[in-house]
Amino acid sequence: MTRILGIDPGSQRTGIGIIDIDEGGRSRHVHHAPLILLGEGDFSQRLKRLLHGLGELIETYRPDEVAIEKVFMGKSAASALKLGHARGAAICAVVMRDLPVHEYAATEVKLALVGKGGADKVQVQHMVGIMLNLKGKLQPDAADALAVAITHAHVRATAQCLGVNTQQAWSRKK
């Protein structure tokens, strides 16, 4: 059994999703939640909350591997920079505990789950719910975190079949 922590980083809310993968490659939902960072003071205090909150979550759930969504250029450069800072704090929380970090672009996650890189949030939420047999509507950040964990599980399974590491299984010639 392998436990994967998926992280959808954000400067206001960071999505957390944890799944277990059995020997047959089947995914089982363990936990999902938003890590709310608003109301934690200034931006540096929010980053501190993210670092400590993820650390506590890692200590509680003991994942074997971590998958995190890459930064994308969104509405503005300032937003992208804040997202990059939050992502950096999340990665620090992970590597401080000697866990491997695997990174996936949002388009790669959408392609892996829905079959098209331009899928919308509703399609991703729906597919995550189906794949993990979850009832009710998922919040977007939790769905994205679970989606990146599922994507890593698929890449991991493909890598094992091919006898390569996960980076080789996912990389493409440019």
Curated annotation (Swiss-Prot):
Catalysed reaction(s)? Answer: Endonucleolytic cleavage at a junction such as a reciprocal single-stranded crossover between two homologous DNA duplexes (Holliday junction)
A molecular function annotated in GO for this UniProt entry is:
crossover junction DNA endonuclease activity
This protein's cofactor list reads: Mg(2+)
Where Mg(2+) 2 binds, per the record, is at: 69
Per the record, GO CC terms? cytoplasm; Holliday junction resolvase complex
Bound cofactor: record note: Binds 2 Mg(2+) ion per subunit.
| EC number, as in UniProt | 3.1.21.10
Binding positions for Mg(2+) 1 per the UniProt entry: 8, 141
The record's InterPro entries line, in alphabetical order, gives: RNaseH-like_sf, RNaseH_sf, X-over_junc_endoDNase_Mg_BS, X-over_junc_endoDNase_RuvC
What GO biological process terms are annotated to this protein in UniProt? Answer: DNA recombination; DNA repair
Where would one find coiled-coil regions in this protein?
none
Swiss-Prot/TrEMBL keywords: Cytoplasm, DNA damage, DNA recombination, DNA repair, DNA-binding, Endonuclease, Hydrolase, Magnesium, Metal-binding, Nuclease
Protein location: Cytoplasm
Catalytic residues per the record? 8, 69, 141
Chain's role: The RuvA-RuvB-RuvC complex processes Holliday junction (HJ) DNA during genetic recombination and DNA repair. Endonuclease that resolves HJ intermediates. Cleaves cruciform DNA by making single-stranded nicks across the HJ at symmetrical positions within the homologous arms, yielding a 5'-phosphate and a 3'-hydroxyl group; requires a central core of homology in the junction. The consensus cleavage sequence is 5'-(A/T)TT(C/G)-3'. Cleavage occurs on the 3'-side of the TT dinucleotide at the point of strand exchange.
Q: Which PANTHER family match?
A: CROSSOVER JUNCTION ENDODEOXYRIBONUCLEASE RUVC (PTHR30194:SF3)
Regarding protein family, the annotation reads: Belongs to the RuvC family.
What is the protein's quaternary organization? Answer: Homodimer which binds Holliday junction (HJ) DNA. The HJ becomes 2-fold symmetrical on binding to RuvC with unstacked arms; it has a different conformation from HJ DNA in complex with RuvA. In the full resolvosome a probable DNA-RuvA(4)-RuvB(12)-RuvC(2) complex forms which resolves the HJ.
Protein name, entry field? Crossover junction endodeoxyribonuclease RuvC
Q: From which organism does this entry originate?
A: Xanthomonas oryzae pv. oryzae (strain PXO99A)
